[in-house]
Regions:
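N-terminal glycine-/serine-/threonine-rich beta1-alpha1-beta2 phosphate-ribose binding loop
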Residues: 1-125, 142
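A contiguous active-site-proximal alpha/beta segment in oxidoreductase catalytic domains
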Residues: 126, 133-142
Length: 142
């Protein structure tokens, strides 16, 4: 470990631009917190550009909370109504706002994440999600 202490690693940014676009899928408390942490990073220019949730009230509350809790990052939040997606397929529309190399935050119940994860990887996106990535269905004993 000490041999690597003096090595400087380059910052990694999305191809073609220094701007890293972020989409949030799952706008509850954990997703909102993860988006806020992403916006607070000093690693590079980051912008929240799309949000998706099954419940309109969750998405609205998340957007309001982000703008109030992170006033220094308000310029990094660019999620107009046309990039706010409601419903079970909203994750696809939110990810479609991104380019390969951008980031999607998956903060949904684990039962749905594997489908979203597959879509994100197929689009060339980086993914942030917490464990468990997915859950196994119940099995019969014996």
């Amino acid at each position: 470990v000490s041999a690597l202490a003096g090595v400087t690693l380059p910052n990694v940014h999305a191809a073609g631009s220094d701007l890293i676009r972020v989409a949030l899928v799952g706008c509850g408390g954990r997703g909102t917190g993860a988006a806020g942490q992403a916006l607070s990073t000093k690693s590079g220019p980051i912008k929240l550009v799309a949000m998706a949730d099954v419940f309109p009230s969750k998405l609205k509350a998340s957007l309001e909370r982000l703008t109030k809790q992170y006033p220094q990052q308000v310029s990094q939040i660019d999620v107009p109504a046309e990039r706010q997606f409601i419903g079970f397929d909203g994750y696809k529309a939110a990810m479609d706002c991104l380019k390969p190399g951008d980031v999607v935050i998956l903060a949904t119940p684990p039962a749905f994440r594997w489908v979203m994860f597959q879509h994100a990887i197929a689009k060339g996106l980086h993914v942030f999600m917490e464990k468990p990535v997915s859950v196994d269905g119940p099995r019969r004993a014996g």
